[in-house]
């Protein structure tokens, strides 16, 4: 094993030589200076706080420690977490991880590393990942509301936390339960120099946006709040703004709704604003001192935020109601009493809010009832504290640490040595300090310090901190671990550091002097009933739920338990919980008092090493056995290593264990057989057993696979053989059936042929020679008849647009079917034409002619299709003057409309009336009633028109005519399609020739002797024929723009 390869110093202190305090300290210092902060004592991890981030964490290291046993890699918290998790998962043993040490030694970070490792290595899946994320995200929420900067630690836990993480049989997390112990709520109203209040206040003021601050009626400046230490508002290495956003995100992940988060922040801001409520003296006629609120603004803002009348708040803060069974008396409070009531209310609100947050987290991460689970507990509790001024909080904190030290002693030092004695294992006793006498001094039910404090709080008459101290001096004057000024004077000892109001306890970690001032008040932890009832009357749902005892209907005159009694009871439950689990220890050490990286104070570390009992722990580990287990469980786990015990063993458990270890040829010095357990001295031997078991499991897995594969192949072969026989039988039967069918069909065919031949032979004289033709003709006619009758019943509609036709049922009738389809269509067309009047026929012929001339050629043609040709667009029939224009021309006027004539010289237009008759085209001025120009249709040579939507066209005349000698005409008509169609038909009727209609954008027009090129272009407006712009370009070119 590579435990000693490439190591700095000794990685496991069990191997340290010589085993003295000096060499132990030098080894820790050498490793610390080389950034090796973890060291083993057997399976105990010693962690020295580096005060910096080291590159020894993350997924890469988690994967590495997951694949190796405890001693195969460098010492690490991950290794201990892996051992605990595997013992829980594989050996079905509940585990607990105890993290102890002074304040600032790195306990909180160690607990985070344990939780992150367990979360990384346990199961996967959407639900499992959700549970893991909720467990991990509980840390930033609890740290924000329960941690603060102290003189010794920038992120000191000011409460105790024990988390039970619950797993299923596969080792996947199901949820958890968090238990909190004694929040240091006195910090809320007063902090020592260089310390801060709880983190959440600074995070809220730094990280909340302006809208949230306005809603909470807060200002960002921390100097505006009496409860915040103005000297230290920022901490190096902490970003309060980003931490606040992280807390909000973590609360959402855990399951807090947006409304719950808002209510928590409102109660938090209310506590902060309570500190700014100033109390002043008020005059009463009776002369009794009274008090009142100096500035009502703060009280009004609090009332508006939580839905409470400001007068109700002021009355509750400045007066007190004394109630007995018969009467109720209201007394005014003086300024000191009102300030005490204000601070007591703030502390109670915050403490109850913290408890509510813990319970709310537990609701989200709790496991369903009835589920079988395994448990891993992680204890992160405040460290041992020795301050300049130690009060009630330090007393109960150090009492808790005494109990944890007692757990370590009894489960590691005392229990281990007593177990050797019970099991009959030879053992040399190792002396150690048993702190049970100190625990008894504090917690004894009748004569302990806590019992005396409760008795003094409940005693009638004048009670004070000094009477409590006098009682302690009387009871413990001869106790070896108790000192005070009175006991020192009695022994004629003089200590100027001991005050008159102080007592001293010699703890396992050193002597601590406690100032009894406020011990009685802090232990009573009383809140006046007026304040309870006022908070219950609030309309704020969360605040109201924090004070259920404020409900007058549930009012009780019973005195609530004291803070000391509650804490003692909680510690007792915690100890019972820890004793029920297999312990794993992380002993945290603080290398210096200044939280500086790289500094190692030998005196400070030596003090911690002594009271943690590291040397005694090493001696016990060196003299003892690394692993012990009952014969039954040991045999159950390792019996597969022996052919004698595997797969069945009918003898006793101890004999079976001896058989297993005997076949493995284990050294007798490595083993000891107790009365009920087997003891293994070194971890190396245990690892060897585990390795042999792993190899054997692989062999058994291979054997199982081999047997399973053989069984599967045999089963598959038998199934295939059975299937083959079945298929063969069915195939042979089917082949015989087919063969029989063919033979039968052949026989029937031969029989039919023979019978036919015999019949034809016998009846040939009765047959006519043309019978076959007659039958064929009959069959063909039947087919034709059937086809024609079917066609008759399925004829398409008589609509000329319907061209559907049934298909021929026989190929021989396809030609006839096509002829019938053509005849039917022609008949439908004739029938349609016969129904038309002559006028309708003429209209359709004109439309047909227009289609042949302009369809697909002229852009304006589609618009003219649905519009009937009118012919008369100037009201010719109703105007006798206009009728005279046709002169002596006989017959009707085919077209009459107003057109525009383009001037040959300048390109300007002038209005004209155009009449089209069967023989002439007549142009006249609109102001005159006589024809100006008469053009015979035989003189019209052709017409040119553009493909655009304009109405421009050129009327080309024969040069030989008298009218044509002056040149062609360039005209513009709004009905150019109709005009040219009628002109085309009139020319055809008059001259028996087709009029040439040219569609083009470029054409030549003859003006007298000159030829002018006309070019028509599309303008940007896009083809509206109502506007044409003419522009002459030289004497032989005219450009027309269609706008």
Swiss-Prot record:
> Keywords on this record?
Actin-binding, ATP-binding, Calmodulin-binding, Motor protein, Myosin, Nucleotide-binding, Phosphoprotein, Repeat
Tell me where in this chain the Myosin motor domain is found: 8-694
IQ domain boundaries? 697-719, 720-742, 743-772
Which effect does the record note for changing residue 910 to P? Found in a patient with hearing loss; uncertain significance
Stored PROSITE patterns: IQ, MYOSIN_MOTOR, TH1
Binding of ATP occurs at 101-108
Q: Which CDD domains match?
A: MYSc_Myo1
Q: How is it modified after translation?
A: Phosphorylated by ALPK1.
Q: Which GO terms describe its molecular function?
A: actin filament binding; ATP binding; calmodulin binding; microfilament motor activity
Which segments constitute the TH1 domain?
858-1042
Q: Which Pfam families match?
A: IQ (PF00612), Myosin_head (PF00063), Myosin_TH1 (PF06017)
Q: Which domain of life is it from?
A: Eukaryota
Q: Which family does it belong to?
A: Belongs to the TRAFAC class myosin-kinesin ATPase superfamily. Myosin family.
Function (record text): Involved in directing the movement of organelles along actin filaments.
| Protein name as it appears in the record | Unconventional myosin-Ia
Origin species, per record, is Homo sapiens
Gene that this sequence comes from? MYO1A
């Amino acid at each position: 094993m590579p435990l000693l390869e490439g190591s700095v110093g000794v990685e496991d202190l069990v191997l340290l030589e010589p085993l003295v305090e000096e060499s132990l300290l030098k080894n820790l210092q050498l490793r610390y200076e080389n950034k090796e902060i973890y060291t083993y004592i057997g399976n105990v991890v010693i962690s020295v706080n580096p005060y910096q981030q080291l590159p020894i964490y993350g997924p890469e290291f988690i994967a590495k420690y997951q694949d190796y046993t405890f001693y195969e890699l460098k010492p690490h918290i991950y290794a201990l977490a892996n051992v605990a998790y595997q013992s829980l998962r594989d050996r079905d043993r509940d585990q607990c991880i105890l993290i102890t040490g002074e304040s600032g030694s790195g306990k909180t970070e160690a607990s985070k590393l344990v939780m992150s490792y367990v979360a990384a290595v346990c199961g996967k899946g959407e639900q499992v990942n959700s549970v893991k994320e909720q467990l991990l995200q509980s840390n930033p929420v609890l740290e924000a509301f329960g941690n603060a900067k102290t003189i010794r630690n920038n992120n000191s836990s000011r409460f105790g936390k024990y988390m039970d993480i619950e797993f299923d049989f596969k080792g996947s997390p199901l949820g958890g339960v968090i238990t909190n112990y004694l929040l240091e709520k006195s910090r809320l109203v007063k902090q020592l120099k260089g310390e801060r209040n709880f983190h959440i206040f600074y995070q809220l003021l730094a990280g909340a946006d302006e809208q949230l601050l306005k809603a909470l009626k807060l200002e960002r400046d921390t100097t505006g709040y009496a409860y915040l230490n103005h000297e230290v508002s920022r901490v190096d290495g902490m970003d309060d703004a980003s931490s606040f956003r992280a807390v909000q995100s973590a609360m959402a992940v855990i399951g807090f709704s947006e409304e719950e988060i808002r209510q928590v922040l409102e109660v938090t801001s209310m506590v902060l604003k309570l500190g700014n409520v100033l109390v002043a003296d008020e005059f009463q006629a009776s002369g009794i001192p009274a008090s009142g609120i100096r500035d009502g603004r703060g009280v009004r803002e609090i009332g508006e935020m939580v839905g409470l009348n400001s007068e109700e708040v002021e009355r509750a803060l400045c007066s007190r109601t004394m109630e007995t069974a018969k009467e109720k008396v209201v007394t005014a409070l003086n300024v000191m009493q009102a300030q005490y009531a204000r601070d007591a209310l703030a502390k109670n609100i915050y403490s109850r809010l913290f408890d509510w947050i813990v319970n709310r987290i537990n609701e989200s991460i709790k496991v369903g009832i009835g589920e079988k689970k395994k448990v891993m507990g992680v204890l992160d509790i405040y460290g041992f504290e020795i301050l300049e001024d130690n009060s009630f909080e330090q007393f109960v904190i150090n009492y808790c640490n005494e109990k944890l030290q007692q757990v370590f002693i009894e489960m590691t030092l005392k229990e281990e040595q007593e177990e050797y004695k019970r099991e009959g294992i030879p053992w040399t006793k190792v002396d150690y300090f048993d702190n049970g006498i100190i625990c008894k001094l504090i917690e004894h039910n009748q004569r302990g310090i806590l019992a005396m404090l409760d008795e003094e709080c409940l005693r009638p008459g004048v009670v004070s901190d000094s009477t409590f101290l006098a009682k302690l001096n009387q009871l413990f004057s001869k106790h070896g671990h108790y000192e005070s000024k009175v006991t020192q004077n009695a022994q004629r000892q003089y200590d100027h550091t001991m005050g008159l109001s102080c007592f001293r306890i010699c703890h396992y970690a050193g002597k601590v002097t406690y100032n009894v001032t406020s011990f009685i008040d802090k232990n009573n932890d009383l809140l006046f009933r007026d304040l309870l009832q006022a908070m219950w009357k609030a309309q704020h749902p969360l605040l109201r739920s924090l004070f259920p005892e404020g409900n007058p209907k549930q009012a009780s005159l019973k005195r609530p338990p004291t803070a000391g009694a509650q804490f003692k009871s909680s510690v007792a439950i915690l100890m019972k919980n820890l004793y029920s689990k297999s312990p794993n220890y992380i002993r945290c050490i603080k290398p210096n008092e200044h939280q500086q990286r790289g500094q190692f104070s030998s005196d400070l570390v030596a003090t911690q090493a002594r009271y943690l009992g590291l040397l005694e722990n090493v001696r016990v580990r060196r003299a003892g056995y690394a692993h012990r287990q009952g014969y039954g469980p040991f045999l159950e786990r390792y019996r597969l290593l022996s052919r004698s015990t595997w797969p069945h063993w009918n003898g006793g458990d101890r004999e079976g264990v001896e058989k297993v270890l005997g076949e493995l040829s284990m050294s007798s010095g490595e083993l000891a057989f107790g009365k009920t357990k087997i003891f293994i001295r070194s971890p190396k031997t245990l690892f060897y057993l585990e390795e042999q078991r792993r190899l054997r499991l692989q062999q058994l897995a291979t054997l199982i696979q081999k047997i399973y594969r053989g069984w599967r192949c045999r089963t598959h072969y038998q199934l295939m053989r059975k299937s083959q026989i079945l298929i063969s039988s069915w195939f042979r039967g089917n082949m015989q059936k087919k063969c029989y069918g063919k033979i039968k069909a052949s026989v029937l065919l031969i029989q039919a042929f023979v019978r036919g031949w015999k019949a034809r032979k016998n009846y040939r004289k009765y047959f006519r020679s043309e019978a076959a033709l007659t039958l064929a003709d009959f069959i063909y006619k039947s087919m034709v008849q059937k086809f024609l009758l079917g066609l008759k019943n399925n004829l398409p509609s008589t609509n000329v647009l319907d061209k559907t036709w049934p298909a021929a049922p026989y190929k021989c009738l396809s030609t006839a079917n096509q002829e019938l389809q053509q005849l039917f269509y022609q008949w439908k067309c004739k029938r349609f034409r016969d129904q038309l009047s002559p006028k309708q026929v003429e209209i359709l012929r004109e439309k047909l002619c227009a289609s042949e001339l302009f369809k697909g050629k002229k852009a304006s043609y589609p618009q003219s299709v649905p519009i009937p040709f009118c012919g008369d667009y100037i009201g010719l029939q109703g105007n006798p003057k206009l009728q005279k224009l046709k002169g002596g021309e006989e017959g009707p006027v085919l077209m009459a409309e107003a057109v525009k004539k383009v001037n040959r010289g300048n390109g300007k237009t002038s209005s004209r009336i155009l009449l089209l008759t069967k023989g002439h085209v007549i142009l006249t001025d609109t102001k005159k009633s006589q024809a100006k120009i008469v053009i015979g249709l035989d003189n019209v040579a052709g017409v040119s028109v553009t493909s655009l939507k304009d109405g421009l066209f050129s009327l080309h005349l024969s040069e030989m005519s008298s009218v044509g000698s002056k040149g062609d005409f360039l005209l513009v008509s709004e009905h150019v399609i109709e005009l040219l169609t009628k002109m085309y038909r009139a020319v055809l009727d008059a001259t028996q020739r087709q009029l040439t209609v040219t569609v083009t954008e470029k054409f030549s027009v003859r003006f007298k002797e000159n030829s002018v090129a006309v070019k028509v272009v599309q303008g940007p407006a896009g083809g509206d024929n109502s506007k044409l712009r003419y522009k002459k370009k030289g004497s032989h070119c005219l450009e027309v723009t269609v706008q």
